[in-house]
């Protein structure tokens, strides 16, 4: 608490160390040295110094002009810096001012002072920082200290430069009055001090500058008060400086600068208390007369000058409309748009900004000061309600918490100060908006505030409501977003309407206050850009306040304030109209609605035509709201309070309420303050007749206008003032307790919602409860937030990205819904008000959320696109749901398509923040159908979510009840995975939709989400980057192939010549059976393909149907879903065509198969469909990648899916190559070409029946021989989802996918050759990596599988790798022999390159394929042999069991990472491809070279192909095991006698094998490092681009996300590794281990598990941030750069994981090698 009287000493309680400012010894008692050097003896920094330290800037003494017979010195004093300047001591000494009944004169200016040249002793300080002084020294000191960068002093100087007599001071006139007022204010002064904010306007200051006022001012202007209010005000209120228009926000810490800025400069409108209530002719004076001091109390006089202006305007208007006798004065104020500061009114407005009313006012009207611009900015940023709300709520939370935390008025001061700071900004804006109206509002506020202070009941409301609605009213912490300035009302501020609405409601809550607001708002009647994008006339606030005023009856200075147009005249005129009209309005409103009645405010949302406005039954009036049909004439904006108020108005009201709720927090503080004040300052007809009437009016309003939204804020607070006066603090406490109880009830989100609803009702019922909320506000805020946070955490865990599930989101959504409901209700007649208020209530503490829209000044599109708005995140799903609920009504409500669109955006902002619903290409319609189908399919899983997705999706463009995005929304929402989400991003910006899956898409999540997503994402996602599940689901839905995949398709018919109709669709493209599946199997599947191919459709005319499915696949090709889809396709193929794996890539991948050239030609397509790798222009990679997408997706369905399916199935068939071939050939063909060619490739469907033999692993060779028309037919072996082709076929795809890639590569080569021949049928070597066993039986996977003998040597290609364990272990099909596979893969890689060359050369590389197959077979056998060796060695040397067969028991780091980072090997392939594309990377060796090098260690081959490294560690281990097992088998074949003798030999053999594998791993690691380097380089490029195009704050988000991505991945890996080690230790504990040791391990495991879960939550949050960043970047980056970004992000984590995996594998191999070596006799060691 600051003692303003003399500031002899004061201790700042504002969180700083005690600061004392004492009269310097050099200064006379009447003087005060502002200079810090001399300014305080105690050596503590004064607030001024601290402030200056914090806000470094230049000091300026500005302005000289003749004035009042005296010469106003216009001195510009520019100091090098405030700090140094002040540090050196300002050296200006003020003689006592009004405190001593004397003018405030500079008695001394130290020599050498920078001001010495300008200032002279005897100068009377008239204005500081545009704040007219009442003449109080403390006021001047506070203002000086509060100055931010500039110290602007206007001094009156007699011509003779001698001290002027005090009489010269204009305040002299009012001194008596002030003295008189002071006693009146005395009881309030303590409150004032506490509440008085430095940010309060000069008007407010005028009040404070009474002795009482001074006390208040001292608190108000004191560094503590001002700083406190400053910093705190915006901490939450200004959630984003970037969004905030306030200069302070932009400048830096909103709180700091804002506070300092707003509270000291803008807010610091030096109160003109000098003007006696009688002497002051200005409205504010009148208002002061009415309740000048009271108002000041309410406003703390510290409301920013803009608030003062508003207050003045309000005063004028209020006085006019009010019974206040000062109507004439108001008019005069009207004339003087800027209310003259009492006593100082003669002096021109501190601000040089001409006010609209300025012209009228003889003295230059004080335009909003810095704080004004500040306020405006803030205001824009926040809803009017939020101004206070921000201060009290979101700041809110800070402010509310702090202030709430502070029970006393001093706390309240800080709280209010904060709000006031927000207010200051708002006020400044308001002031800027309409000085006169603003001032009128302020005056009204001031008028009210004293009484309110006296009568806390009103005050709490006032604080919420903005003490007299004047944004200036500091006490009421008027919402920063009260737009008193047009700018404030401009669309700039998203929250504008809400803010204004809040203000209005607040105004309504407090008659005086709202009067001010009304004046202010009406002045600024400009349509506000509602946070919900609903623009309502600023007048609506005015109306609300007007209503309240009406309720207040004559005393209520209700003025329907015309919208303050940018033109001051208009505003002026409107104000006059208001003045004239106000009585009518009052009477009319009163007549229309009882005192309690609240006039719903017509706020055209979205600047909708008035006609579109629905009468907004203010949800605030939960119970009922009488809408004044009276159209305020001053509402030049055609804004009519009348029922025309649109649902948006209702929404605004809701927003207001929610904002008010935020304000309520401040109000609660205020209430507390008020409560004690009300005891001291009880509003009574005798003591405070005006306030009493206002209170009565407010009470009536509160009664008539139940606080639905403002449960805390409760408009009834005005009415409550009387009640509170009756109940006082007791009632408040009771209310607080009740509110707390409610909060507790609402601990759960659902509970919160219900509580909020209940509270809303209760609030309406119990205004007092709302009143008591001041105390509970903070608790509510904190408790509510904590509950919300907990709920959010729970929900996030459960729902991942389903923000709608977040309770907080619910609250927000409720607010939005409320708004919409209000619209709907008003529009449809639904009585949503009660519910909405409830929602608002729920949101109240978290009203920050309501600010969601308002915070941002982003355009609607930006808002839609910005997930960066945390508030809106929660709103994503809820709004969608709500939209559906209120879809019809909302549609009705929304007037035009644009409106509907805006509304939709608003509702689905979270879901698709930035992306307007896009209609996809022609295939989109199909997709729509697909979506419908998928929707049906997904509905089972998604249910309402899919509906929301539909709402979001462009499916229902605008025609769907004005929800153009309805379908789109559903689709987006369907996106189960972030990858799909990303895909949707790329494919359709409209599709930006929050991911259903929460955190990284675990395989499970992906699957589930994808099922839903597939329908919506298929066309939505150009590529489901990380969510193959989309395809999988589409497939599952279409074919139910999953179920079939459950059953092993052992009987795969020889591939039927299946023709997949490519985009041309006329000619069946050889899609193998996949084509049929895509085209015929299922619409969804086809749709999926089509979706997948849609991107391709752009480049390749593929039947949209198939394209859809393929697009999904293509997109998901890189994703597990693709694999799953392929898997499903395989199943489908079996069902439909006995085609297994090829479906995706081949069915639809004609495009994939299209020549790499085409791919190159259409890199965008690739980009869309696949992750970055696709983007890379190199057709080969892309082709491969596409084929990979298609085939791997089909053949190598997500490894997880496949593994799962494989585990399910005893056997799996994975002809990876088969898919690959057709797609590539198709790719080779131009879209038109291949259709024309109508290549029908029949891939022989080889059925691998691999009986798993647990004990022995032997390859059972099944040759499915069918004549191989290498060029006539490619027979695709029906393969289980374990369509993992032999590694040789997927040299680049290290996993199953690689095999797919390899087959694709092979196919590509073959097809390319064939394609060269047009409709060439290319024999496709199909490598079935047939693994049916689960991980557990991975080592048992050695069921013998021999490649079917293909006539063309495809049989070799058809080699089926049986590495069940590996396959199960990894998503990738296990390769029978790692080594062989490596060789095979290297061959495949070579073959692939050869194929590429063949494409170019039209050479047929089939021959090369055969060698590759042979190599693959050799590799498989080698692996099997190795596995056998391992088994044999383990059988004979148990000591080596654990190390040689770790998978039996051991858990690996990657096991624990499973699901957290859905593994997409396509990414690795992409990385490799990118790297290979780099000039520095040599192209794969030619097939011939490979053939020559067939004997080269497989490690070399593997290294070349990078397949091995791409293979998961588990996979590698499996391969090794298999190989070892083969060796063991061979050993087993030896007689037992020989075993003993040959054991060492076997060990040596195994050592050799492991050594080779180890070398391969090391080579792979090197390759991986290259990939990492390439990816990092890409990231740097992306970063440079992002930095250039994005805003600094957005770039920071990007950088932080990238940095956190690596950190979180490493954290998860570290924790997973540690946890795996602990679990392995536990699993391997001997029975003899002591219980203590076991307990220790168990505790470690528990701790690590908990930490691991926490890390996973971080990952989920990171995923959300990733979406946010993506949305941001999507606004700036082109598709290619965006694809680069996506690829970089994906690869960053993927490479980290892969690197860790390789390291683990290397360690394992090294340990195995070491153990084996150690176990060998010395003589046997080589």
Curated annotation (Swiss-Prot):
Keywords: Actin-binding, Cell junction, Cell membrane, Cytoplasm, Cytoskeleton, Developmental protein, Membrane, Microtubule, Tight junction. GO terms for biological process: apical protein localization; brain development; camera-type eye development; camera-type eye morphogenesis; cell migration; cellular pigment accumulation; ear development; establishment of melanosome localization. SUPFAM superfamilies: PDZ domain-like. Its main location: membrane. Residues 329-338, 657-667, 936-948 have a biased composition (Basic and acidic residues). It holds the Pfam family ASD1. It is found in: Apical cell membrane; Cell junction, Tight junction; Cytoplasm, Cytoskeleton. Signal peptide: none annotated. Residues 1427-1721 form the ASD2 domain. Residues 917-926, 1191-1205 have a biased composition (Low complexity). The keyword NAD does not apply. One of its GO terms (cellular component) is cytoplasm. SMART domains: PDZ. Residues 788-877 form the ASD1 domain. Residues 294-373, 425-451, 657-676, 697-785, 913-968, 1007-1080, 1092-1120, 1166-1240, 1269-1299, 1471-1499 are annotated as: Disordered. May be involved in endothelial cell morphology changes during cell spreading. Required for eye pigmentation. In the retinal pigment epithelium, regulates the biogenesis of melanosomes and promotes their association with the apical cell surface by inducing gamma-tubulin redistribution. The ASD1 domain mediates F-actin binding. This is Protein Shroom2. It comes from Xenopus tropicalis (Western clawed frog). The lineage of its organism: Eukaryota, Metazoa, Chordata, Craniata, Vertebrata. The gene is shroom2.
């Amino acid at each position: 608490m600051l003692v303003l009287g003399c500031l002899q000493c004061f201790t700042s309680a504002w969180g700083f160390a005690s600061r004392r400012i004492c009269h310097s010894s050099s200064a006379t008692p009447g003087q005060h040295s502002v200079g810090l050097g001399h300014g305080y003896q105690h050596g503590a920094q004064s607030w001024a110094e601290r402030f200056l330290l914090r806000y470094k800037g230049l000091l300026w003494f500005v302005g000289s002009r003749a004035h009042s017979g005296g010469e106003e010195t216009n001195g510009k004093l520019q100091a090098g810096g405030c700090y140094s300047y002040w540090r050196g001591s300002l050296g200006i000494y003020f003689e006592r001012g009004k405190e001593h009944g004397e003018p405030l004169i500079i008695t001394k200016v130290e020599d050498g002072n920078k001001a010495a040249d300008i200032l002279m002793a005897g100068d009377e300080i008239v204005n500081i920082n545009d704040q007219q002084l009442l003449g109080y020294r403390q006021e001047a000191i506070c203002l000086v200290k509060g100055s931010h960068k500039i110290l602007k002093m206007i001094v009156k100087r007699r011509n003779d430069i001698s001290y002027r007599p005090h009489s010269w001071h204009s305040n002299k006139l009012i001194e008596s009055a002030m003295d008189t007022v002071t006693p009146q204010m005395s009881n309030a002064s303590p409150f004032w001090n506490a509440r008085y904010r430095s940010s309060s306007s000069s008007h407010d200051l005028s009040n404070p500058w009474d002795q009482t006022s001074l006390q208040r001012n001292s608190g108000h202007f004191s560094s503590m008060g001002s700083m406190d209010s400053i910093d705190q005000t915006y901490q939450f209120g200004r959630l984003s400086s970037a969004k905030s228009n306030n200069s302070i926000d932009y400048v830096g810490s909103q709180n700091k600068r804002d506070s300092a800025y707003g509270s000291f400069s803008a807010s610091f409108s030096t109160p003109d208390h000098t003007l006696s209530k009688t002497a002051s002719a200005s409205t504010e004076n009148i208002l002061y007369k009415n309740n000048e001091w009271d108002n000041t109390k309410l406003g703390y006089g510290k409301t920013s000058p803009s608030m003062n202006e508003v207050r003045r305007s309000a005063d004028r208007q209020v006085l006019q409309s009010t019974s206040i006798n000062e109507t004439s004065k108001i008019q005069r104020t009207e004339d003087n748009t800027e209310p003259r500061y009492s006593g100082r009114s003669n002096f021109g407005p501190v601000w040089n900004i001409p006010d609209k009313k300025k012209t009228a006012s003889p003295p230059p009207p004080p335009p909003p000061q810095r704080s004004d611009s500040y306020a405006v900015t803030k205001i824009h940023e926040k809803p009017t309600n939020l101004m206070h709300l921000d201060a009290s709520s979101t700041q809110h939370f800070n402010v509310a918490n702090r202030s709430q935390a502070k029970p006393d008025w001093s706390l309240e001061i800080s709280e209010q100060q904060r709000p006031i700071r927000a207010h200051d900004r708002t006020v400044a804006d308001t002031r800027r908006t309409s000085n006169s109206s603003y001032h009128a509002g302020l005056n009204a506020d001031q008028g009210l505030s004293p009484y309110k202070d006296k009568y806390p009941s009103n005050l709490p409301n006032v604080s919420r409501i903005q003490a007299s609605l004047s944004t200036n009213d500091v006490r009421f912490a008027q919402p920063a977003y009260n737009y008193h300035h047009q700018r404030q009302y401009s669309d700039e501020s998203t929250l504008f309407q809400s803010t204004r609405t809040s203000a209005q409601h607040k105004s309504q809550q407090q008659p005086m206050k709202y009067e001010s607001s009304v004046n202010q708002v009406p002045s600024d009647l400009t349509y506000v850009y509602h946070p919900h994008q609903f623009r309502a006339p600023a007048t609506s606030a005015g109306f609300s306040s007007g209503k309240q005023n009406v309720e207040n009856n004559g005393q209520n200075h209700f003025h329907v304030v015309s919208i303050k147009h940018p033109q001051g005249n208009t505003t002026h005129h409107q104000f006059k109209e208001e003045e004239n009209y106000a009585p009518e309005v009052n009477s009319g409103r009163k007549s229309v609605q009882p005192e309690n009645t609240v006039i719903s405010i017509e706020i055209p949302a979205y600047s909708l035509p008035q006609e579109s406005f629905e009468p907004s039954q203010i949800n605030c009036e939960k119970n009922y709201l009488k809408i004044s049909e009276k159209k305020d004439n001053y509402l030049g904006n055609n804004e009519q309070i009348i029922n025309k108020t649109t649902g948006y108005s209702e929404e605004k009201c809701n927003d207001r309420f929610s904002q008010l709720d935020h304000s309520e927090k401040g109000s609660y503080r205020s209430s507390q303050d008020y409560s004690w004040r009300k005891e001291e300052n009880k509003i009574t007809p005798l003591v405070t007749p005006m306030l009493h009437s206002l209170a009565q009016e407010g009470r009536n309003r509160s009664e008539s206008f139940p606080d639905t939204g403002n449960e805390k804020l409760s408009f009834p607070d005005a009415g409550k003032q009387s009640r509170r006066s009756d109940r006082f603090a007791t009632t408040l406490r009771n209310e607080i307790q009740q509110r707390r109880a409610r909060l507790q009830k609402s601990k759960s989100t659902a509970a919160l919602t219900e509580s909020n609803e209940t509270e809303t009702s209760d609030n309406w019922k119990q205004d007092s409860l709302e009143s008591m909320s001041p105390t509970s506000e903070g608790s509510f805020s904190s408790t509510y937030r904590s509950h919300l946070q907990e709920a959010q955490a729970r929900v996030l865990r459960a729902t991942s990205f389903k923000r709608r599930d977040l309770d907080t989101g619910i609250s927000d959504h409720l607010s939005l819904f409320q708004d919409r409901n209000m619209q709907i209700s008003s529009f449809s007649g639904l009585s949503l008000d009660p519910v909405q208020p409830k929602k608002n209530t729920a949101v109240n503490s978290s009203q920050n959320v309501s600010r969601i829209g308002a915070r941002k000044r982003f355009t609607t599109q930006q808002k839609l696109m910005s997930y960066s708005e945390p508030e809106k995140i929660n709103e994503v799903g809820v709004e969608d749901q709500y939209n559906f609920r209120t879809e019809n009504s909302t549609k009705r409500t929304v007037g035009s398509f644009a409106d509907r669109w805006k509304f939709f955006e608003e509702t689905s902002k979270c879901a698709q923040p930035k992306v307007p619903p896009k209609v996809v290409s022609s295939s989109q319609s199909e997709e729509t159908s697909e979506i419908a189908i998928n929707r049906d399919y997904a509905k089972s899983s998604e249910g309402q979510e899919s509906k929301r997705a539909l709402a979001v999706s462009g499916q229902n463009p605008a025609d769907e009840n004005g929800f153009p995005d309805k379908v789109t929304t559903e689709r987006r929402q369907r996106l189960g995975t972030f990858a799909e989400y990303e895909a949707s991003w790329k494919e359709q910006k409209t599709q930006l939709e929050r991911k259903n899956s929460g955190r990284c898409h675990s395989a499970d999540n992906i699957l589930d989400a994808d099922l839903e997503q597939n329908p919506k994402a298929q066309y939505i996602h150009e590529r489901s980057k990380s969510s193959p599940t989309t395809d999988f689901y589409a497939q599952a839905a279409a074919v139910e192939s999953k179920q079939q995949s459950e059953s092993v398709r052992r009987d795969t018919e020889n591939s039927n010549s299946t023709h997949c109709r490519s985009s041309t669709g006329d000619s069946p493209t050889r899609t193998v059976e996949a084509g049929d599946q895509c085209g015929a199997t299922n619409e969804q599947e086809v749709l999926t393909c089509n979706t997948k191919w849609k991107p391709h459709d752009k480049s390749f005319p593929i039947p949209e149907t198939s394209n859809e499915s393929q697009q999904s696949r293509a997109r998901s090709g890189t994703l597990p879903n693709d694999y799953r889809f392929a898997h499903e396709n395989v199943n489908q193929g079996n069902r439909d065509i006995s085609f297994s794996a090829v479906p995706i890539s081949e069915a639809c991948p004609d495009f994939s198969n299209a020549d790499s050239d085409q791919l190159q030609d259409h890199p965008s397509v690739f980009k869309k469909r696949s992750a970055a790798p696709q983007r890379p222009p190199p057709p080969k990679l892309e082709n491969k990648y596409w084929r990979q997408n298609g085939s791997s997706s089909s053949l190598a369905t997500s490894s997880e899916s496949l593994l799962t399916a494989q585990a399910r199935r005893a056997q799996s068939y994975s002809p990876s190559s088969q898919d690959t071939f057709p797609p590539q050939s198709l790719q080779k063909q131009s879209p038109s070409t291949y259709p024309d060619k109508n290549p029908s490739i029949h891939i022989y469907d080889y059925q691998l029946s691999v009986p798993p033999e647990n004990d022995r692993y032997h390859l059972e060779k099944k040759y499915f021989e069918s004549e191989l028309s290498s060029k006539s037919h490619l027979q695709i072996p029906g393969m289980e989802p374990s369509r993992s082709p032999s590694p040789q076929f997927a040299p680049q795809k290290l996993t199953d996918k690689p095999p797919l890639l390899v087959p694709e590569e092979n196919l590509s080569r073959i097809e390319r050759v064939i394609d060269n021949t047009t409709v060439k049928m290319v024999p496709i070597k199909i490598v079935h990596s047939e693994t049916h066993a689960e991980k557990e039986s991975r080592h048992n996977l050695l069921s013998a599988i021999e490649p079917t003998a293909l006539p063309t040597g495809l049989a070799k290609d058809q080699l089926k790798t049986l590495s069940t364990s590996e396959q199960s272990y990894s998503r990738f099909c296990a390769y029978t022999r790692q080594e062989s596979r490596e060789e095979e893969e290297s061959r495949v890689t070579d073959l692939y390159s050869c194929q590429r060359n063949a494409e170019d050369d039209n050479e047929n590389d089939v021959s090369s394929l055969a060698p590759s197959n042979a190599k693959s077979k050799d590799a498989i056998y080698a692996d099997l042999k190795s596995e056998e060796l391992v088994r044999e060695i383990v059988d004979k040397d148990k000591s080596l069991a654990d190390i040689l067969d770790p998978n039996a028991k051991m858990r690996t780091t990657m096991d624990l990472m499973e699901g957290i980072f859905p593994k997409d090997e396509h990414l690795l392939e992409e990385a490799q491809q990118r790297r290979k594309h780099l000039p520095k990377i040599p192209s794969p060796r030619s097939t011939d070279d490979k053939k020559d090098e067939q004997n080269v260690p497989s490690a070399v081959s593997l290294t070349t192909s990078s397949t091995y490294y791409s293979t998961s560690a588990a996979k590698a281990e499996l391969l090794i095991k298999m190989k070892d097992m083969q060796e063991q088998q061979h050993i087993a074949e030896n007689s037992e006698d020989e075993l003993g003798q040959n054991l060492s030999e076997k060990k040596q053999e195994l050592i050799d094998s492991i050594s080779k594998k180890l070398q391969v791993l090391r080579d792979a690691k090197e390759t991986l490092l290259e990939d990492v380097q390439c990816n990092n380089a890409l990231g740097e490029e992306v970063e440079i681009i992002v930095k250039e195009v994005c805003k600094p704050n957005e770039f920071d988000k990007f950088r932080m996300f990238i940095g956190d991505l690596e950190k979180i991945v490493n954290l998860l890996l570290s924790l997973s590794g540690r946890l795996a080690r602990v679990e392995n230790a536990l699993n391997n504990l001997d029975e003899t281990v002591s219980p203590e040791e076991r307990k220790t391990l168990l505790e470690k495991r528990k701790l690590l598990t908990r930490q691991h879960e926490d890390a996973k939550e971080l990952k989920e949050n990171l995923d959300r941030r990733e979406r946010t960043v993506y949305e941001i970047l999507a606004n700036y980056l082109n598709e290619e750069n965006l694809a680069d970004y996506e690829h970089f992000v994906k690869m960053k984590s993927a490479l980290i994981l892969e690197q860790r995996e390789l390291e683990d594998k290397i360690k394992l191999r090294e340990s195995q090698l070491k153990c084996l070596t150690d176990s060998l006799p010395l003589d046997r060691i080589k």
